[in-house]
Amino acid sequence: MRILVLHGPNLNLLGKREPEIYGTLSLDDINGALEALGAEFESDLGFFQSNSEGALVDAIQQAPENYDGILINPAAYTHTSVALRDALAAIGLPFVEVHLSNIHRREEFRHHSYLAPLALGQICGFGLDSYLLGLRALFNHIKN
């Protein structure tokens, strides 16, 4: 089983950016924890981070060639990107949307997700555990 992990804009700044909201773990720390969990499931993970909406759309469109599912933190594009939503709808791979912070406890504009209606589920507010829970759920869905 192969899973693509997509990280949206500004997540390359994790560990430095607003640690009171996003915590102190770096993106490498998160990827390392996901890699360890992937090994438990005998799964290969691919990782991609971009601040560019188009690059993320390209990665989504190419995913069916090599991956069985997607774990995505679309970050700010959660609330704005019809392009990401349409790309995910077009390819038909199962995906889980994750967020480090609870987007529903934050500013009003962060409460809406264009992706959530298409996702297997959305997990938010648990920091690193949002990613780990999302990956476990995706593994279980694909296996069953």
From Swiss-Prot:
It catalyses: 3-dehydroquinate = 3-dehydroshikimate + H2O. InterPro entries: DHquinase_II (IPR001874), DHquinase_II_CS (IPR018509), DHquinase_II_sf (IPR036441). Pfam families: DHquinase_II. Transmembrane segments: none annotated. CDD domains: DHQase_II. Keywords: Amino-acid biosynthesis, Aromatic amino acid biosynthesis, Lyase. It comes from the Bacteria. Its EC number is 4.2.1.10. GO terms for biological process: amino acid biosynthetic process; aromatic amino acid family biosynthetic process; chorismate biosynthetic process; quinate catabolic process. PROSITE patterns: DEHYDROQUINASE_II (PS01029). The record marks R17 as: Transition state stabilizer. GO terms for molecular function: 3-dehydroquinate dehydratase activity. Signal peptide: none annotated. The keyword Lyase applies. Pathway: Metabolic intermediate biosynthesis; chorismate biosynthesis; chorismate from D-erythrose 4-phosphate and phosphoenolpyruvate: step 3/7. Belongs to the type-II 3-dehydroquinase family. NCBIfam families: aroQ (TIGR01088), PRK05395.1-1 (NF003804), PRK05395.1-2 (NF003805), PRK05395.1-3 (NF003806), PRK05395.1-4 (NF003807). Catalyzes a trans-dehydration via an enolate intermediate. Homododecamer. This is 3-dehydroquinate dehydratase.
